[in-house]
A protein has these predicted regions:
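Membrane-anchoring alpha-helices and their flanking helix-loop junctions
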Residues: 1-117, 135-194
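Membrane-interface loop-to-helix entry segments
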Residues: 118-133
Length: 194
């Protein structure tokens, strides 16, 4: 496998794997971040970049170790890349860029806030996170890199914790409307409709 492709896969998985950790900084303390006079992103974004650097340092010793190298694994990987990109596109429908960027969670005065339960969100509550998972699985499957598989597992565990915290924060914000939505729509894996 070309070194450039291996390194792109590794860095992509490093960045994706830290997304749940980034949000774990936000959701338990959403009220704190909203109470700040200045944008909390001045603290949060450099902290997230520091997470990337730390994860690169931690995983660098084995970033070239592959479980396998098979060209055919790129066939399902391309399907996963496509699914991830489609989920990102569908996630934009009925959702503002501010919502996608998490501004209502951290900035005060981000009104009006409304719960979006249509489109792709009628099938899965967190389609962007599902898109991230598809992208990480695609890099892992296509490259066979141990580090990509490990980072995907790490993101899955931290993502599950983060989703629980985000659900609590959304329930606090939207109340019974969110409780009903959560009881009928799965978090990540959509129900298959036949």
């Amino acid at each position: 496998m070309p070194v450039l492709l291996r390194n792109v896969a590794w860095i992509a998985c490093v960045i994706y794997s830290t997304i749940p950790a980034f949000w774990l900084l936000i959701h338990p303390q959403a009220d704190f971040w909203r109470s700040r006079k200045r944008s909390p992103y001045r603290i949060l974004l450099p902290t997230w970049v520091a997470m990337w650097v730390a994860m690169v340092g931690f995983t660098a010793p084995w970033h070239g170790v592959a479980f396998y190298e098979r060209r055919w694994t790129w066939i399902p990987a391309i399907g996963l890349f496509g699914a991830g990109l489609l989920l990102y596109k569908l996630s934009r429908n009925h959702f503002t860029l501010a919502q996608l960027g998490g501004l209502p969670e951290v900035l005060r005065g981000q009104n009006p806030q409304h719960l979006t339960t249509t489109g792709v969100r009628a099938y899965v509550r967190h389609p962007v996170y599902l898109g991230h998972l598809c992208e990480m699985l695609a890099w892992s499957m296509g490259t066979g890199l141990a580090v990509c598989w490990a980072l995907t597992a790490f993101a899955t565990v931290t993502g599950a914790i983060m989703i629980k915290m985000e659900d609590r924060e959304l329930e606090k914000r939207f109340g019974e409307q969110y409780r009903q939505y959560r009881s009928t729509v799965p978090a990540i894996l959509p129900k298959i409709i036949m």
